[in-house]
Amino acid sequence: MRQDLSLRLEQFKKQYVADEAVRSRIAEPPVKFIGDEIMELAVAALLQGENVLLSGGKATGKNILADNLAWLFRRPVYTVSFHVNTDSSTLIGTDTFTGGEVRLRRGPVALAAQYGGFCILDEINMAKNDAVAVLHSALDYRRLIDV
């Protein structure tokens, strides 16, 4: 990786240390991504505060790249595998009744936002409009989720 990117990445990791509560979600990937140019482009985009969309055929390394990026940034990973029944409550969270109280059980998107994690949205092309709509404000300039 280019030296300037490596330095900025190290600065990022020092400035944004993961919360102790989620460090178990930071795991070294079992497979190393091979593709320096793509890795550098993704790291540069993320360091600029951009989102990264990985598109391609099956078994082309998209998830491996995402896992490797999360490891490089030392961020917790939250993965959503979309299917026809994935809705907004699956992503953001839903109310549950626990111990005589109604509590919010946060979903992976809300947890990734709370802890500064990488949210890997796998097979997002399978998502219903309801599920995609809640992502808009999180992914655009607002960087905001109303829960």
Place the predicted regions along the sequence by residue.
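AAA+ P-loop NTPase catalytic core and its hallmark functional loops
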Residues: 1-147
